[in-house]
């Protein structure tokens, strides 16, 4: 297997890499074949000659941490964004993507349910965050993820209210929030506008 792994890792044959990326995995009941295939997919995922569309496909569909970790450092923001949106991400991995250099990757990671509340709070406090992502974060615990932990969702919504990039529409919504802390923060921001 090591020779095949190295061959795939260093291959410049995009067509062969693409075919391997799209090949169905063996049945999980054949553990040896399944493990071998997922290990080899890691080599394909990490090869820059694998077409971007195939790397995005792997990033969106693979539940395997070794492959997702490899793709999370891909040179293409499109691939990293796909990893950030993968519902099978480990929370530490999607958390790392909330700090990505690409605003689109960060925004996608913050919308992933696997993202920790600490990372969501940091995103809500980020003065460079876009208003669409702030709209999402400002809806946590209300319209979005209504069963979210109340205290944590409230902290995030309050941080959104204090963010200079929050949209006027979201600020108006937060001024009517069920939490008095969120209401006060939003009303203070509205008064300063």
Which residues are covered by each model-predicted region?
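Alpha-helical scaffold segments
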Residues: 1-193
